[in-house]
Amino acid sequence: MLADRSSLTEPEVLDLVSGGDAEAVGPFAGRPALVVRLDGATGALPAATAVLPCVVVGVGVPGDVTVGCDVLVTDVEDPPAPWVQADPSAVVAAAEASPAAAVALAQLLRLGPRLDVYSALVAESLTYGLLQSGPMYREWLATRRKRQHVASTRPVLVEREGTQLSITLNRPEVRNAFDVAMRDALVEAFRLVAADPSITSVEWRGDGDNFCSGGDLAEFGTVPDPVTGHLVRMSRSAGVALAAVADRVTAYLHGACVGAGIELPALAHRVVAAPGTTFRLPEVTFGLVPGAGGTATIPRRIGWPRTAWLGLTGVVLDVDMAVAWGLVDAVE
């Protein structure tokens, strides 16, 4: 009967779980997303949806009880947080296209409100590493166009003037793609700030037409194994290093900010974007979740449901919406 229903009400979801039929949804059931109509909801969903192995998409209007949903969509224009004006079919389609990653992202974000930044970064890295062993990511690696890694002698420029430190991403020839060398250089720069309290402010920019186009695709699939990848990510974590000094950092963004290009800056005390800047989290389409800290940093600016929507759909967010949501503090 469930397979014939495009959406359920809150009582129907409760019946689904209490009746022991929770496995009727999820990747193995061919239903990685469940649309729940929130009209008349009483707030009883969290206990039920916490155990559902699927993305829970709440549909309603601002004012409805929203707890227990991973994503909240409405047809109301300019809805308040945590709603997104969108059609639920976009989330469902994204989950069906990449079910394991979509469900993993939803489950990861459910943990977020109970975790500090460091713990959330650990949880993200573990989830990312797990999905690296998954069939969709392996298929994506096998079918993608091979790219030659372009090494940069100085992937990050660091300059000091008085009490101010300037950090500049310096791979404009590849749209400042985030590679291992850039990560390591950023970690060193942020650790320098942590070690020197006389540095009172940090201005973080990117050279060229784009702040950062995300992870360098030429390096995808080069980690020896997922376990090593996790250990390296947490030993040389730009997110951890940035978190220690975030109160002194202002990020100046422009052009494309993809993946790491917004996941890391979102942690900065202040984020300023140029007109026309865009933002995107494409990782679920690869069979992964954000891996540079996005599930730990972005929700602290825009909330977990809107982060889930960004990550699941991979939609391009324009700068005006980014400001309205609080992902960006100002446009200059």
Predicted regions and their residues:
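N-terminal accessory interaction module
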Residues: 6-29, 34-94, 98
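Conserved CoA-thioester-binding segment of acyl-CoA-metabolizing enzymes
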Residues: 1-49, 140-207
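Catalytic-core regions built around general acid/base machinery
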Residues: 45-49, 189, 234-245
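Terminal peptide-recognition signature
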Residues: 105, 167, 171, 185-186, ...
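Glycine- (often His-adjacent) and acidic-residue-rich active-site loop
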Residues: 65, 206-239
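Short, active-site-adjacent cap segments at secondary-structure transitions
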Residues: 107, 209-212, 258
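Crotonase-superfamily enoyl-CoA hydratase/isomerase domain that binds
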Residues: 50, 86-146, 293-325, 329
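Crotonase-fold acyl-CoA enzyme core
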Residues: 62-89, 93-95, 243-260, 264-332
